[in-house]
Curated annotation (Swiss-Prot):
Principal location class: cytoplasm
Keyword check for Cytoplasm: yes
Species this chain originates from: Saccharomyces cerevisiae (strain ATCC 204508 / S288c) (Baker's yeast)
One term under GO cellular component: cytosol
Transmembrane segments: none
The protein, known as: UPF0303 protein YBR137W
Pfam families listed in its UniProt record: HbpS-like (PF03928)
Subcellular location: Cytoplasm
Length: 179
């Protein structure tokens, strides 16, 4: 079960979370393995977590490989729009290019435009929360990118990070259960 930290959400909303703390959260977003079945299980887990935490909110969830191959895609309720797909693409592109969550990069960007800070087109990249890299503890490169769109950007980010960490912890517990 994923329970969002309301105090952390308030801090994210007010931008009172240092980049180092955001990076520490990202470092906890790792899985020991990542198969097609893991992608499906993770996506289903996140869909259920979104439905529990944000009933009746239309949210799009995407898990894709760095090469763009989509392993999982769903929405929670009717009402998501094609615009969510565009947000997913732009957030995912940001996380994969810069190696950090799209929220982290938005905080790092500060008040500058993407063009000023990073020399990228804001029509192609989104510096808003929701895209988080799925990492391996054995590699410097991500397995995939998890992207959520449809909530406020801080909620998208916290839902992605919290769900991924909770899923990883539950998977580890299952792996360690020798019964």
């Amino acid at each position: 079960m994923v329970v969002l930290d309301k105090k952390l959400l308030e801090r994210l909303t007010s931008r009172k979370v240092p980049l180092e703390e955001l990076e520490d959260m990202e470092k906890r977003c790792f899985l020991s393995t990542f198969t097609y079945q893991d992608a499906f299980d993770l996506g289903t887990y996140i869909r259920n977590a979104v439905k529990e935490n944000f009933p009746e909110k239309p949210v799009a969830i995407d898990i894709s490989l760095p090469n763009g191959h989509c392993l999982f895609r769903t929405v929670t309720y009717g009402g998501s729009a094609l615009d969510n797909d565009f947000w997913i693409q732009r957030k995912k592109k940001t996380a994969l290019r810069f190696g950090h969550s799209s929220f982290y990069m938005g905080c790092k960007k500060g008040d500058k435009t993407p063009e000023e800070k990073f020399f990228v087109d804001s029509k192609e990249y989104a510096f808003h929360g929701g895209a988080v890299l799925i990492q391996s503890e054995r590699s410097d490169y991500p397995y995939a990118c998890l992207t959520i769109s449809g909530l406020k950007q801080e909620e998208d980010h916290l839902m992605a990070v919290s769900s991924l960490i909770a899923f990883a912890n539950e998977s580890l517990e299952e792996d360690l259960n020798l019964d």
